[in-house]
Amino acid sequence: MPEAKPAAKKASKGKDAPKEAPAKQTPEEPPKEAPPEDQSPTAEEPTGIFLKKPDSVSVETGKDAVILAKVNGKELPGKPTIKWFKGKWQELGSKSGARFIFKESHDSTSNVYTVELHIGKVVLGDRGDYRLEIKAKDVCDSCSFNVDVEAPRQDSSGQSLESFKRSGDGKSEDAGELDFSGLLKKREVVEEEKKKKKDDDDLGIPPEIWELLKGAKKSEYEKIAFQYGITDLRGMLKRLKKAKVEVKKSAAFTKKLDPAYQVDRGNKIKLVVEISDPDLPLKWFKNGQEIKPSSKYVFENVGKKRILTINKCTLADDAAYEVAVQDEKCFTELFVKEPPVLIVTPLEDQQVFVGDRVEMSVEVSEEGAQVMWMKDGVEMTREDSYKARYRFKKDGKRHILIYSDVAQEDGGRYQVITNGGQCEAELIVEEKQLEVLQDIADLTVKAAEQAVFKCEVSDEKVTGKWYKNGVEVRPSKRITISHVGRFHKLVIDDVRPEDEGDYTFVPDGYALSLSAKLNFLEIKVEYVPKQEPPKIHLDCSGKTSDNSIVVVAGNKLRLDVAITGEPPPTATWLRGDEVFTATEGRTHIEQRPDCSSFVIESAERSDEGRYTIKVTNPVGEDVASIFLRVVDVPDPPEAVRVTSVGEDWAILVWEPPKYDGGQPVTGYLMERKKKGSQRWMKINFEVFTDTTYESTKMIEGVLYEMRVFAVNAIGVSQPSMNTKPFMPIAPTSAPQHLTVEDVTDTTTTLKWRPPDRIGAGGIDGYLVEYCLEGSEEWVPANKEPVERCGFTVKDLPTGARILFRVVGVNIAGRSEPATLLQPVTIREIVEQPKIRLPRHLRQTYIRKVGEALNLVIPFQGKPRPQVVWTKGGAPLDTSRVNVRTSDFDTVFFVRQAARSDSGEYELSVQIENMKDTATIRIRVVEKAGPAENVMVKEVWGTNALVEWQPPKDDGNSEITGYFVQKADKKTMEWFNVYEHNRHTSCTVSDLIVGNEYYFRIFSENICGLSDSPGVSKNTARILKTGITLKPLEYKEHDFRTAPKFLTPLMDRVVVAGYTAALNCAVRGHPKPKVVWMKNKMEIHEDPKFLITNYQGILTLNIRRPSPFDAGTYSCRAFNELGEALAECKLDVRVPQ
């Protein structure tokens, strides 16, 4: 298909033109849309968000094209989404092929985004209109440009530069003499061009201006003529009228491929071309490689059509296709569009520690789909993954982002975007906090016994050191330090008095220490008389006051009380007033001769109270009391609830716990999660002391749950009950463009537009309020919200000046009000009455009998005008005509029109002494009556003159013509003679001699032909003359011919299981006998084959062919004069 050349390119053929001057450097020819000299080009003016729009380009085939645009980031609320389109909707992306490269860059200093589209090795299929679309939240803008693809360019004179040669062997460009012999071979071409140039210059207009005029619109002729100084406008127009665009028609193709096709992935597509000769060989190519028939690519021949069917299109089929017939080719490009990829399982918020392994996964609807990961609005690519310690993984429909060793800077908001949806989640990375699961306890041991300090921390990998009175403890024969899992032990064998002191365990890398005291119980041997009263030696560490001990719930408590006396006393323990004697269980007593121990394996709140030990012997008794106080983590907070929500925040309120664990509550910790998720996210890391907290950074429209922990010196409580699910939503923005539509003496009609931002909460309606000027009290005009963007406020005081405002209402509450800038005076404005007569009623309005008459005529005027209809000065007949009048229009209605409804109707609209009138002319028509007095006036030869008179009833419409028919008296079959005959007479010719004819006439008007015709009262008799016929003698022609195939059999490739047909056409007389054969074996009465012969068109239908049916088929036709044979090959392919 020939391509149109730009005018600038033809202008370079002048005598003094440079040989390789590019088209854009031709100063005499600006483009068609070039602005006047006093204006700057529109492409350089910043329009909307574009600082520089993409320019239309013209590229030679096989070269690269670059399109550049710049976007003002100051006009955008965030990072823009950039899309390129070919045509109107065909989106270009990573699936468009490797030839399309998209680049984006951002200059942070000037806040300018630069976008580029690179098209490599341009082909003819790239020609067309393109569109660039920029979108950022609610801001969207687009602009279009064109890419024109040309054939490779020669030098400016139309000849190859190789025509100029230099004689000699010198390598220098100036060596030797110029040899112009190459030009002599194309002298005729040069002379033709000179002659053409002379013809173009006969008006003194350069050829490039003619090319510009040929491509311009007619409305731009005068502007171009004025711009280039052309004064002979009449001659210029005559010349343009004579100029004809020669379109070179294709010799091989009668219908070519479209420039581009688009198909969804998984579907099939048919590429159809039509060739001029069905016998021409045809080949299909994909990216330059010939396509062979297969189950994927199916070739079909239907007449002159050649069809390529591509089944189950994949992204590999996204390519350039061409079809070649002899030396001619046509091209197209196929774009395979992926279905929208939906997000099935979104990302979930995660809270991890530094060094942990993190996997953020999302599940999409399509396997192998492309997704884009973003962190804090910046795209994450595989190229950057080597520097940033992350990697991507695909597992079927799941896409996973993996951090093997997460760092604190990896925290942030992560987003996954597909072409059908997006989701986001937050990753919080915090420093590891070591949790003490079991603290070390104070010990009291005797000499030569073993002392064991044991603690448990949350991290198995944490190491630490033991200190005694600030000095590090080193292992020795008596001292053993061990670390097994989360447990750390310090074991001291054969305890000595110098081992007494404060022992501390300090984990490495944490500002944490665990301390306990080792008390050495020294046994002194003294001389005691044989009888000594019992004595209690009470010395327990951990007491806060005299005889008071504090223990943490869950820890072990052992009270070793030394007793003396002679004879050895008996010890009794009491809890409150009850004697405690258990020797086994969680709480029990251990008795030794010189010591009585009270042991609690795991302290509970119920163990708190006063404990008494009483020792007795015959000499006396001794009593000591100990108050045990058990401290614990507090109870969970109560009455946790969300009191209010916003666009991305919520207010959380709770009550302090009833039981504080024996220690004052120091603060609270909060957590939240999305409803349905199992992952809780910490909101605060430092304790929060108040009971009201504002949680932020939530996603509007997502359901959340929250819970609260209480914290005291002992630890963190159990979580509270979850709040009811809540959704962060915000009121809408203020309604827009509030205006006054109408004002009367007591009402005001307002209208507005919906808010710019509605949000996830939607909008339930609008509330209208008004306030008298000078007052600050706003009065609601409607109790229930109105859904439409308009409202009439009624019962207003006449003459008052009132301000109005409108607020949007949704589940989150009221929006900001939209208020009128000026107060409105409540007084109706008198407007002169005016009838707005529709255009079709300004002329006679014609309807047919029986049809409905429904006329709607709008008018204006305030207050409501008085409307009066009359016909000929008299009131209308209300039994036939219905009239309905509103504030803005009047309706004239007749259910079934009759001819009596025709006439002139007057409509008047009056307000006080002001009046406007209009006249409506109505004509009701029907079919006309038959023609009158149809007579045959004269007969001569085979002609007859018929005349008639117009019908008495014209159906209230002009007679537009007559319909004339004739009939032979013998058969009385009527035949048409004339249609739309305008006159009341006609001459009927070519009548048959010897016959007698009748004639009938139908009248015709706007409704059609009359129901009955007017029939001629007399007949036209065509008499015979005395001419005798002498037949000529001739030799009878011999019509017998031998069989000959007009259309031969064609080789076929069919798909197994689908019925196939072999067709050919044969001619012969007498009618030849036809025999079908397969592999030279005659096909008999086989139900698999159906043979038909319709007027020489022979068809062999093969029902559901299989590979066994493949072979050579032949058709043999023979009669007494000879025979003919046609053969073809049938190939049956099995779908893969």
UniProtKB/Swiss-Prot annotation:
Segments for region (Disordered): 1-55, 151-177
Keyword terms of this UniProt record: Actin-binding, Cell adhesion, Immunoglobulin domain, Muscle protein, Repeat, Thick filament
Gene Ontology CC terms: cytoskeleton; myosin filament
Basic and acidic residues composition bias: residue spans: 13-35, 163-174
Coiled coil regions in record: none
Biological process according to GO: cell adhesion; muscle contraction
Ig-like C2-type domain span: 46-149, 250-339, 340-432, 433-533, 534-633, 833-927, 1043-1136
InterPro entries in alphabetical order: FN3_dom, FN3_sf, Ig-like_dom, Ig-like_dom_sf, Ig-like_fold, Ig_I-set, Ig_sub, Ig_sub2
Disulfide cross-links: none
Similarity-based family: Belongs to the immunoglobulin superfamily. MyBP family.
Sequence ranges assigned to domain Fibronectin type-III in this UniProt record: 636-732, 734-829, 930-1025
GO MF annotations in UniProt: actin binding; structural constituent of cytoskeleton
Protein name: Myosin-binding protein C, fast-type
Keyword Repeat included in the entry's annotation: yes
Functional summary from the UniProt entry: Thick filament-associated protein located in the crossbridge region of vertebrate striated muscle a bands. In vitro it binds MHC, F-actin and native thin filaments, and modifies the activity of actin-activated myosin ATPase. It may modulate muscle contraction or may play a more structural role.
